[in-house]
Amino acid sequence: MTTKDTTQTSPTLLLGKDRIKAKFEENRKFIADALEYSGGTHSIEDVYLACATGEAQLHPLEKSCIITEVVDYPSLTVCRIWLAGGDLDELVEAEKSIAVWAKSQGCDAMEINGRKGWQRQLKDYTATSVVLTKDLRNE
């Protein structure tokens, strides 16, 4: 599995390189809130670096923020909604425009890594797997 380079067409780049940091900072709370549910896989600095380098895309909204990444699997390319924080209604509505953007990038599907509640909100998504984690640091 590799991450597709979307630096030439990502929403982050459309902000302009000088605006990425400012927009990220404006949305830091939404991103930090979403990271609380990520199992400690990334720091907020990791997310900023991924957005700044084009590995992930920053989708700033009025009352929310979504972070996506385009992932090439061997048989298809997906746009993964990696982090989402803020107003639930706005996030659900924004998914539609992100899906349009993803299709324009050659994505075959959308994918969401998130809490179980997203399944109730996004009726056109199908649960295809369950992610289980076990913390080995204290064993």
Where are these regions (language model features)?
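Intrinsically disordered, low-complexity boundary segments flanking structured domains
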Residues: M1, D46, I67-V71
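Short amphipathic alpha-helix that is part of the acyltransferase structural core
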Residues: M1-H42
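Active-site/acyl-donor-binding loops of N-acyltransferases
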Residues: T2, N113-K116, R120-E139
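Generic structural motif
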Residues: D18, V71-Y73, G86, D135-E139
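Charged/polar, solvent-exposed surface patches and flexible loops
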Residues: A22, E26-K29, D33, D46-A50, ...
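Active-site rim helix/loop that mediates acceptor-substrate recognition in acyltransferases
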Residues: L35-A56
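Conserved donor-binding loop and adjoining core beta-sheet/short helix segment
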Residues: C51-D89
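Acyl-donor binding region in acyl/amide transferases
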Residues: L76-D124
